[in-house]
Amino acid sequence: GMATKAGTALGKVAKAVIGAAL
């Protein structure tokens, strides 16, 4: 549902931020 989509989006953003930090 919408919660899952939001969670996935946040996960992608988090991974992008972590990748940039590394």
UniProtKB/Swiss-Prot annotation:
Query: Main localization of the protein?
Result: secreted
Give the GO cellular component terms, alphabetically: extracellular region
Q: What is the reported tissue distribution? A: Skin.
Question: Which compartments is it annotated to reside in?
Answer: Secreted
Instruction: Tell me which positions the record assigns to the signal sequence.
Output: none
List Leucine amide occurrences by residue: L22
Any single biological process term in GO = hemolysis in another organism
Which top-level group of life is the source organism from?
Eukaryota
Record bears the keyword Nucleus: no
Q: Which UniProt keywords apply?
A: Amidation, Amphibian defense peptide, Antibiotic, Antimicrobial, Cytolysis, Fungicide, Hemolysis, Secreted
Ligase is among the record's keywords? no
What does this gene product do?
Has very strong antimicrobial activity against Gram-positive bacterium S.aureus, Gram-negative bacterium E.coli and yeast C.albicans. Has strong hemolytic activity against human red blood cells.
Q: Give the family per the record.
A: Belongs to the gastrin/cholecystokinin family.
Record's protein name = Antimicrobial peptide 5
